[in-house]
Structure formats: structure tokens, C-alpha cells
Regions:
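Juxtamembrane intracellular "pre-TM" segments in multi-pass secondary transporters
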Residues: 16-27, 213-261, 285
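Residue-level signature of mid-helix packing/kink "hotspots" within the transmembrane helices
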Residues: 49, 77-85, 169-170, 302-306, ...
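Helix-breaking motifs and short loop linkers at transmembrane-helix boundaries and internal kinks
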Residues: 63, 95, 116-122, 150, ...
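Helix-loop-helix hairpin linking two adjacent transmembrane segments in secondary transporters
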Residues: 161, 165-211
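Extracytoplasmic gate region of multi-pass secondary transporters
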Residues: 51-52, 254-310, 365, 369, ...
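Conserved MFS/SLC helix-loop-helix module at the cytosolic interface between two early adjacent transmembrane helices
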Residues: 82-121
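Structural signature of the two symmetry-related core transmembrane helices
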Residues: 98-112, 327-342
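Cytoplasmic helix-loop-helix junction between adjacent transmembrane helices
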Residues: 126-167
């Protein structure tokens, strides 16, 4: 026996050491831009997550129905897509870091007004105004990430940006329920006013990369020198309404982009409505109560969405050279599987099944959405990526605007008695809306046939 042990020790000693896992090379800018831009999404999402976490208490205080509650989420998006096309136009022509910084600085002041409202209509006006700022941020942030990072790490860069809002919304939902129970729901909105204004300074100091500089550069190619942080960036191309219309027309002429727009909008819209009503669902359809419902909803977002985001980001980078249109394939498969799992949780199932399976379903669906912006950067020329992200966001915003309101309307159609009070049946509403995610997955999978031609066209145009 001793001889066997000695032989084993000798073999282990003779075995070559396992090579250390190579560190990810994030390129000349490092991870700082990705972290700062993730912070922008985080702050935006904290504010967005507070409302679902305190919605029941706000309804009791201001006295409005589920339909009006859904309108609060809808208005946030409706006003946003009014400016989404101009936002993409600006992102393709001016300094994107400065655009984001200015929006953040003003956003912090407006956010605090949520705590001062006295009527439903005042609340609606403030929520609608906040939607404009977040819409302007999105195309500029995504366009920047594509220029900061090479294609072999772009999936992870976008994953970091996409994970931050889910973490922020989870924190917003969870904190909102606790703060509202202790000192009232108005204080919950005051928590997010200051950080946004402070983050604006960090964004202002980020370097402005050249458009397209990180798109598959040759090994010997030296990148163009980056502009100093303080240097103004003039318009790079012609401007005006006609230029905006032309850019939109060019973007809409990319078949893969059209599939990405439709497929992602259906999934994102359905998920937006589900996320908006998640806390109320657990309050009404389980014995968890108000604080418990908000806590479970926050945990589902945190664990499911964030884990799905990071896993998907790494898989996109790993698979993109193995399969044609790998980001699209990953998005379609993940959303289809996630939708099937999610539907099962709205049936009459025990809590021990509902909570973990719903978290897994969210991980799949959100993970699929992470691959969408990576695919856009490959099939769209860098000079119109801002408008491409805007057009995609435009359709997603329309679906997202309708979803909370539609779910609220559907819930009011099915009565549910909770503690002697008649409320809307959210489980039935979710069962009607969730199958739309299957349709989005199908559109994504069918759109892969255009990927090769669109990648070649984008490379020649860029």
C-alpha cells in the first residue's frame, strides 16, 4: 500500500504544472469605461426599480387602479421613444461621453421630484420626464462600448453593461419595500437623486474613442490617437433632418437588424411588463405579503438576470467564431427555453417550484437579450451604430410601453380576492403575455440566414 502511495506522489510530482488561466486582455482602455458605463445603467435602474417595489403603497396613498399603475410604467417609455431617434443621431455625430454626462447631471435633480408628488397625474408627469434621459443614454453608451472593445471581449463588455441595470433594479425593488415599510415610500425616491449627478463627472472624463477603431484591427495596426478628454468633437458627417431620415433608412435596410429589432422587442417588451408587476404578483398570489413580495422579486432579478447576463456574455465571445450568427442563435435558443420555463411558474404550482424555476427562466431570457447588441455591432457599419441601437430601442420601447399597461388591463379583467379585497389576477395576465416570447425567439432564429451578407456589407461600408 505504501508503494502505491509513493508511486502516486511521484506521478504527481512529475506531472507538469497546470497552466494558469490567461487574463482577459481588455485592450488599450481597460475595464474602466465598461465599469463607468455600467454605473450609468445601474443608477438609471435603481430609480426604475423603486416604483415596482412600492407600487402597492403608492396605490393606497394616491388612490389609483392597476390600469393606472401600468400607465406609470408605460409613460416612462412613451416619452423616451419620442427622442430615441434624435438620440441615435447625436450619438453618431457628437461626443458621446459628453452627451451622457449632461443627461446624468440633470437627471439627478428631476428624480427627487418623485417624492414631492401629491396626485397621480403629478406622479405620471415626473415618470414620463425621466424616461427621456434614459433613452438618450442608451445609444451613446452602446456605441461607445463597441468602439472601446475588440470583438473578442465585446460580449463580456456588453454583459457588464447589461448586468448593472438588473443589479440596480433588484436593489431598487428590494430597498424600496424596506424603506417604504420603515419611513414611507417617498423617502425611497430621494435615495437616488445624488449619485447620478456625481457619476456624471466620471463619464465626462472618459476618453472619446474613434468610431470603428476596435473592429477587428490587424495585429500590426496601430490605433488612431484618441482625442484628449477636453477636446470638442465636431460633427463627423452631414447633419439635419434629411440626414437623420437617411441614416434610419440605411439601418432599416439591414435584414439581420430588422430581425434583431423584432425578436428582441417582443421578448424585451414581455419581460418589461413581467418585471414591472413581479412584486405585486408575489404579494397577491402567495402568502409572502408586501415586503416579502418585493424581496422575492428583487432576488429573482438579481440572481436570475445577472447570472444569465454574465454567462451569456462569455458564451457569445466563445462561440462567435464557431458558428455563423452565434449571438443570434444563442438569443433565440435562450429565449425559447426561458419562455417555456416561465409559463410553468404562473400555473398553480408550489412556491418551492415557482421561485427557483422563475429565476432560471429569467436567466435564460435575459441572457438571450445580451447577445443582441453584440450582433448589431457586427452587421451595422460603425458610422450608423448609434441610429441602429436607437431604432432597435425604439421598437423595444414601444413594446415595453404597452406591456405594463396591457398586463394591468388583463389583470383587471380577472378578479382575485386578496384579504377580502378584490384585485386583478396577475397570473392569468402573465399566462396570456408570456407566449409572445416564443414568437420573438422564432424571428431571431429565422433571421440568421442574412448574417453573412450583412457582416460583409458592414465591413465594406465601414
Amino acid at each position: 500500500m505504501a508503494d502505491i502511495d509513493q508511486t502516486t506522489d511521484d506521478a504527481e510530482a512529475a506531472a507538469p504544472p497546470r497552466p494558469a488561466r490567461p487574463r482577459t486582455d481588455w485592450g488599450r482602455y481597460g475595464k474602466r469605461p465598461a465599469r463607468v458605463l455600467a454605473g450609468v445603467g445601474f443608477i438609471d435602474a435603481v430609480d426604475r426599480g423603486i416604483l415596482p417595489g412600492v407600487l402597492t403603497k403608492v396605490q393606497e396613498d394616491l388612490g389609483f387602479s392597476d390600469t393606472q399603475g401600468g400607465l406609470l410604467g408605460t409613460a416612462f417609455v412613451l416619452t423616451g421613444f419620442l427622442v430615441v431617434l434624435p438620440a441615435g443621431y447625436l450619438a453618431d455625430r457628437y461626443a458621446r461621453t459628453k452627451i451622457i454626462a449632461v443627461v446624468l447631471a440633470s437627471w439627478g435633480l428631476i428624480s427627487g421630484l418623485n417624492a414631492a408628488v401629491r396626485t397621480f397625474w403629478q406622479f405620471l408627469l415626473v415618470r414620463a420626464t425621466l424616461g427621456i434621459g434614459e433613452t438618450i443614454d442608451n445609444p451613446a453608451s452602446q456605441s461607445l462600448l463597441a468602439d472601446y472593445y475588440r470583438t473578442d471581449v465585446r460580449g463580456r463588455a456588453f454583459a457588464l453593461q447589461r448586468a448593472a441595470p438588473f443589479f440596480g433594479q433588484a436593489l431598487g425593488v428590494g430597498l424600496a419595500g424596506g424603506v417604504a415599510a420603515l419611513v414611507g415610500w417617498r423617502w425611497a425616491f430621494l435615495l437616488v437623486g445624488v449619485p447620478g449627478s456625481l457619476l456624471a463627472l466620471a463619464v465626462w472624463r472618459l476618453p472619446e474613442p474613434t468610431r470603428g477603431e476596435s473592429d477587428e484591427p490587424a495585429a500590426s495596426e496601430q490605433p488612431e490617437p484618441v482625442l484628449p478628454v477636453s477636446a470638442p468633437v465636431p460633427p463627423e458627417r452631414d447633419s439635419g433632418p434629411r440626414a437623420l431620415v437617411r441614416d434610419v433608412r440605411i439601418a432599416m435596410g439591414v435584414p439581420t437588424l430588422r430581425s434583431l429589432m423584432i425578436g428582441s422587442a417582443i421578448a424585451a417588451g414581455a419581460l418589461s411588463g413581467l418585471g414591472f408587476w413581479a412584486a405585486a404578483f408575489y404579494e397577491r398570489h402567495t402568502t409572502l405579503g408586501s415586503g416579502g413580495g418585493a424581496g422575492i422579486a428583487g432576488a429573482l432579478i438579481l440572481v436570475g438576470a445577472i447570472s444569465g447576463t454574465f454567462v451569456a456574455g462569455r458564451q457569445v465571445d466563445r462561440l462567435r467564431h464557431r458558428y455563423e450568427g452565434a449571438p443570434m442563435l444563442l438569443a433565440g435558443v435562450c429565449q425559447g427555453v426561458g419562455a417555456a420555463l416561465l409559463m410553468s411558474t404562473f400555473l398553480d404550482v408550489p412556491l418551492w417550484y415557482r421561485i427557483p424555476v422563475q429565476g432560471i427562466a429569467v436567466a435564460f431570457i435575459v441572457g438571450g437579450l445580451v447577445a443582441i447588441p453584440v450582433m448589431i455591432t457586427e452587421v451595422v457599419a460603425p458610422t450608423i451604430r448609434g441610429i441602429a441601437f436607437s431604432v432597435t430601442s425604439f421598437l423595444s420601447a414601444m413594446a415595453g410601453a404597452a406591456s405594463p399597461l396591457v398586463i394591468g388591463l388583463l389583470a383587471d379583467r380577472f378578479e382575485l380576492v386578496v384579504d377580502g379585497e378584490v384585485k386583478g389576477n396577475l397570473a392569468n395576465a402573465f399566462l396570456i403575455v408570456t407566449p409572445l416570447i416564443f414568437l420573438g425567439a422564432l424571428v431571431l432564429l429565422r433571421g440568421r440566414r442574412h448574417v453573412a451578407g450583412d457582416i460583409a456589407a458592414a465591413a465594406s461600408a465601414g
